[in-house]
Design a protein with these regions (language model features):
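Glycine/Thr-rich phosphate-binding loops that ligate phosphate moieties of nucleotide
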Residues: 1-41, 60, 85-133, 141, ...
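Phosphate/pyrophosphate-binding loops at sites that engage ATP/ADP/AMP, CoA/4′-phosphopantetheine
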Residues: 66-85, 170-173, 219-232, 257, ...
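Stable alpha-helical structural segments in soluble proteins, enriched in small hydrophobic residues
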Residues: 65-77, 187, 276-279, 414, ...
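Conserved phosphate-binding catalytic cores of ATP/NTP-utilizing and phosphoryl-transfer enzymes
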Residues: 1, 250-259, 269-286
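N-terminal phosphate-binding loop and adjacent alpha-helix
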Residues: 32-80, 122
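Conserved phosphate-binding loops in N-terminal lobes of ATP-dependent enzymes
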Residues: 16, 29, 77, 81, ...
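Gly/Ser/Thr-rich active-site cleft segment
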Residues: 10-12, 136-270, 380-387, 412-416
């Protein structure tokens, strides 16, 4: 009798559920649904305006999409719920919310419905940069050893800066919140009926590590005396490892989704990290870039080596027995969409419509006619700040070399190239610090839909690129974790390595570097590095001064 697992992938804008045969890997059904409130970065549903760099979500959206997507894949596949042995999920991170001790989000409570700090702070909420800057200064002053495991800087995207922002700006929300929790863990709480904390989010976004736990109470007291016991008061020291079972589906959640009560639920994982088993990566030196609105770079190693500017290195962070490094770029697909939404003449839309192609494809067709360097443009890919390797949300984008002859497709291609240069910066910093990058894989929407961009990346990094063979790679990865939560006795797997080997897959198509393009891109990358260091490492802080004027 065939057995199945469901993987649920919570992205930035939508949720995807996938039902898969745990032995054959056959994908029987997929369901995708956008969040009703999407990303709230200008105002709350009430109309209350938000400040600069805010990005919120409504947790009710997460429950609503589950009520639709899980029943949908069960119905489509026509499988018996009795044969669905496991459920896994991944989520964006650090995406966090304040809740009561029973799990009720504060934004569900009437008196907080108009309070922005009561809502979910999405991963790309960057309004806690002031708190992140202070945290880094204090950590350096106190010689905190754990800081070097995060590239020497904590990001404004992470849990503690976001909670500290709440304490500074809305202390009544801080006081009312019994727990401050990752959305991934909150969803499992709704599924299983009890609070859990996963090692992936805690390790990469919460400053926890397997060996030493969290930073000391003394450190948190130095941030703010009110935060001295923040870990015990708002978080938890009980951290569950990846690849294990978080709990079982409750009767209430079973009734809501059509799953069987008692179905195994996996410890959740971050939405980027979950792609690693989905492409079958199990060896050190294999890097995976998950390319969507942003890009996250995952790399496995047998060694723990501090690397400046990365997002973190966590023991067993993806697979047991290996260190998993994370780096990333916080604006990739968002760059391209910004350009489409704001910078194209109507004539381009008219011509695309006439040809019967979407506007991205229309622009790419124009870009493909040009060779590297032909436009004379170099851009800095910082439209949403910088994650790796500068870790600075106060930096902004730049386009150099425009003339009266510059065309929209030139700018579009320069933005694509800039994101490729950013990935090469990340690869170079790993290698310079003794961490091998031997092979490169890509997953996510861009890798599936955009051959031109993938060829540019292969040329810029001068490495072959293998592509994930699953349009819903995040959901497939989550299904693998779900099958492992069930275990071999129930028809799943006892090891993530076994699950990845059986179900992970890549396409036959490989993008190989084109030597003449590599030579040209090496020259362009040298120019990118000059701009990167000049504007990003303090020689000229004009971007920060402009942002201060904008926000004054």
């Amino acid at each position: 009798m065939a057995k199945y697992a469901i993987g649920v992938d919570f992205g930035t804008l939508s949720c995807r559920a996938l039902l898969v045969d745990v032995k054959t890997g056959e994908e029987l059904a997929t369901s995708v649904l956008d969040y009703p409130h999407s990303v709230m970065d200008e105002e709350l549903p009430s109309g209350k305006k938000l400040g600069a760099d805010w990005a919120l979500q409504d947790p009710q959206d997460y429950l609503d999409v589950l009520k639709t997507t899980i029943p949908d894949v069960i119905k489509q596949s026509e499988v018996n719920a009795e044969d669905i042995i496991g459920l896994g999920l991944d989520f964006t991170a650090c995406t966090v919310m304040p809740v009561k001790k029973d799990g009720t989000p504060l934004c569900f409570i009437d008196k907080f419905k108009d309070e922005p700090h009561a809502y979910v702070k999405l991963w790309k909420h960057h309004a806690a940069q002031a708190q992140a800057t202070k945290l880094n200064e204090i950590a350096e002053k106190m010689n905190q050893d754990w800081l070097k495991l995060y590239g020497g800087k904590i990001s404004s995207e992470w849990a503690i800066p976001k909670l500290w922002q709440i304490l500074d700006e809305a202390p009544e929300v801080y006081d009312e919140a019994d727990r401050f929790i990752e959305a991934a863990d909150w969803i499992v709480w709704q599924m299983c009926g009890h609070e859990i904390r996963n090692s992936c989010c805690a390790g990469y976004k919460g400053m926890w590590n397997k060996k030493n736990g969290y930073p000391s109470d003394e450190f948190f007291k130095a941030l703010d005396p009110r935060m001295e016991h923040v870990i015990d008061e708002k978080f938890s020291r009980d951290i569950l490892p990846l690849g294990s079972k978080a709990g079982e589906v409750t009767a209430e959640f079973a009734a809501m989704t059509g799953l069987k009560e008692g179905t195994a639920v996996a410890v959740p994982i971050i939405d980027a990290h979950v792609f690693v088993p989905a492409v079958g990566i199990t060896k050190p030196g294999e890097m995976l870039a998950i390319m969507g609105t942003s890009t996250c770079h995952m790399l496995l190693s047998e060694e723990e080596i501090p690397v400046p500017g990365i997002s973190g290195v966590v023991a067993d962070g993806i697979l047991p027995g290996l260190y998993a490094y994370e780096a990333g770029q916080c604006c990739v697909g968002d760059h391209f969409q910004w350009f489409i939404d704001n910078c194209l003449p109507k004539s381009y839309y008219d011509e695309a419509e006439k040809q019967g192609v979407n506007i991205h494809k229309f622009l790419r067709q124009k870009c493909e006619r040009k060779k590297p360097g032909e436009s004379g443009l170099v851009a800095l890919d910082w439209w949403n700040g910088v994650r790796s390797v500068l870790v600075d949300a106060d930096l902004s984008g730049m386009m150099l070399g425009m003339t009266l002859r510059t065309k929209p497709e030139d700018i579009y291609r320069a933005l694509i190239e800039a994101t490729a240069y950013g990935t090469r910066m990340i690869i170079d910093v790993f290698r310079e610090n003794g961490v091998d990058v031997n092979s490169f894989y890509a997953a996510g929407g861009i890798s599936q839909k955009d051959p031109m961009t993938m060829q540019i990346y292969a040329d810029v990094i001068n490495m072959p690129i293998k592509i994930a063979d699953c349009e819903q790679g995040g959901a497939l990865g989550s299904a693998i974790y779900g099958a492992c939560a069930a275990g071999a006795q129930k028809g799943g797997y006892d090891s993530l390595y076994d699950g990845a080997a059986a179900l992970g897959k890549v396409k036959d198509k490989v993008y190989y570097p084109i030597p003449e393009n590599v030579e040209l891109y090496n020259k362009l990358f040298d120019e990118y590095k000059i701009l990167h260091d000049y504007f990003g490492r303090g020689e000229n802080n004009v971007m920060k001064r402009l942002k201060e004027l904008k926000n004054s």
